């Protein structure tokens, strides 16, 4: 039944996107992307699905380095991604998230300056956090970020020099992700 329900949902969504009417009902379809080691807590199970309505976001990110993301990493990474998308992509901006809460957000003349300002907002909570940058990570930014333990870094790209700096931290996860898109919906289920 899940196969036909998936197919029907795709058809419904196509008609909905191509209509000016507001529907009373909304259906969604997704494909299993990965089964996670555990859910929010170790005794819970969790899975990650890719939505038929989106082509960007954490499920579509490329993991360049590090181990598989956990459920909590995904939640925090998504919070960081949503926050950083609120800022102008032309102005270097960095957001640091811990337990789904911002502990630093700043813009600057350079990405390195933006990171330094964001980190200075709460140097304690930033430890083990998720960092989202709205521009390609450069060598100077990487040299600053590497100074503290970080779980995940999300950015639209990374230079070869920055990659080399991060390689010394094998558990650091680096996600390359489209930040500014016009996907049809943002879907969540708790």
Describe each PLM feature range.
Residues 1-182:
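Active-site loops and adjacent core secondary-structure elements that bind or stabilize anionic groups
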Residues 180-190:
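Single conserved hydrophobic/aromatic residue that forms the stacking wall/gate
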